[in-house]
């Protein structure tokens, strides 16, 4: 059973964890999307899957810091235009730090023999990786 991480007290996190625990109880296959920007969060999440004896496949997407900054700016401007939500801009340093944390997290996960880590370098690799996972799984 996953417990809420102290640093993350938002509704979305609590809701996701409740759904995940229900899926564990029903022994469902689970697809979980996360940024893995924090190794503690990643380990907490993956340990829960290991305890339940799940096969774990991590598909890591490439990082493009400049594109992340551009999309952040576009979201900010879109929210200002909409006028119905509070816009929030993430500073460049925060995005860069998250990118470094993500890479460090992947390096640590790569060392774990219970985790099948696939790193996508370009979109052409996606089908190849999916075929590989399906062949290894069944």
Residue ranges and their predicted role:
Residues 70-138:
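Conserved GTP-binding G-domain of TRAFAC-class P-loop NTPases and closely related GTPase folds
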Residues 48-53, 57, 132-138:
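A signal for specific C-terminal beta-sheet/loop modules enriched in small/flexible residues
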Residues 50-72:
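Conserved phosphate-donor/acceptor-positioning beta-strand/loop module used by diverse small-molecule
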